[in-house]
Curated annotation (Swiss-Prot):
The keyword ATP-binding is annotated on this UniProt entry: no
Keywords from the UniProt entry: Hydrolase, Magnesium, Metal-binding, Nucleotide metabolism
Residues given in the record as substrate binding sites: R72, S73, G74, N85, T89, I90, D91
Native species: Methylocella silvestris (strain DSM 15510 / CIP 108128 / LMG 27833 / NCIMB 13906 / BL2)
Lineage: superkingdom: Bacteria
Role summary: This enzyme is involved in nucleotide metabolism: it produces dUMP, the immediate precursor of thymidine nucleotides and it decreases the intracellular concentration of dUTP so that uracil cannot be incorporated into DNA.
EC number: 3.6.1.23
Coiled-coil residue spans: none
Protein name per the record: Deoxyuridine 5'-triphosphate nucleotidohydrolase
Length: 160
């Protein structure tokens, strides 16, 4: 395992009493983010509704890294609630509050309580590219095939 990366974090007043994001197991890749909705209230996501849920946190991610907001698998499996723009990107130069865009794909309203774990934060390295315009590109076996062109039929099936 590599050396831990230091991330600056600032709690906003509406999230000051909540625990900081934390890894929930020794092998966890993501830090769990909590909902910083008003104390004593709940946020209800109706079926098909999307909402930006506050975390009460501002991050200082080092240059050459990003934060990725990803769904919690349990919320998706049990309630159909997921991060709509997964993975959401937090750029290293962003200094606003981290918000999690959740959507309820489930059939029932879903209530989010203050302090509930709503998403995972993954810190990842970023590779910046330099684009070079050209008149021709190297040929490949795949060519311009896309949208299912590399999928294989199951054994005994014929692709149509």
């Amino acid at each position: 395992m590599s050396e831990p990366l230091t991330i600056g974090i600032k709690r906003l007043p509406h999230g000051a009493d909540l625990p900081l994001p934390a890894y929930q197991s020794a092998g966890a890749a993501g830090l769990d983010l909590l909902a910083a909705i008003a104390p004593g209230s709940k946020l209800t996501l109706e079926p098909g509704e999307r909402r930006l849920v506050p975390t009460g946190l501002v991050l200082q991610i080092p240059p050459s890294h990003e934060g990725q907001l990803r769904p919690r698998s349990g919320l998706a499996l049990k309630a159909g609630v997921t991060v709509l723009n997964a993975p959401g990107t937090i750029d290293s130069d962003y200094r606003g509050e981290v918000g999690v865009l959740l959507i309820n794909f489930g059939a029932e309203p879903f209530e989010i309580a203050r302090g509930e774990r709503i998403a995972q934060l993954i810190i990842a390295p970023v590779t910046r590219a330099v684009l070079v315009e050209t008149d021709g590109l190297e040929a490949t076996a795949r060519g311009a095939g896309g949208f299912g062109s590399t999928g294989a039929a199951a054994i005994g099936e014929t692709r149509r």
